[in-house]
Amino acid sequence: LKIIGHQWYWSYEYPDHGNFTFDANMIPEDELKPGQKRLMDTDYRVVLPVGKKIQLLMTSDDVLHNWGVPSFGVKLDTVPGRLNETWVQINKSGVYYGVCSELCGGNHAYMPIAIEAVSEADFKKWVTKAQTEFASVDDGVAPKLAATEKVDEDATASVNASFAITPNGIRLAQSTAGQ
């Protein structure tokens, strides 16, 4: 699962399952359905299988965010131009919640994370449905993400060079960008 932080929502990519992508935004209070949690539920939940080791790759499109899901013991920064990695294994079906745990701007408090853990069979059914649902939405998300990845490569070179020397002139690291 690839996770991309944005001001102020998350994008999720499933590269091992057809590479479909969707955005997950907080559900406004006046649109909540019975059983949905205020400030915690999203319009689209991440769906993951129980009992499987899952690689989580995280980055950001704009500023520093933090993808935090306490029940998984995960709290990892999403950094523009960098891909951070961790692994999880969910052992029990259910819905798990988290939030952006890094102050990232004015609407930081409205970046919930909602994950639904399901059986392997239900996950496969969901993937089949999601591949169709998210492939049929032609909103330009995939091209924007491809462009973002190119911009991130360029930004990484710039960031590596600009942060190699502190304001008082101390050299912290040698930039290897472009070598």
Task: Please report, for each region that a protein language model flagged, where it lies by residue.
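Non-transmembrane, membrane-proximal soluble domains of secreted or membrane proteins
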Residues: 1-179
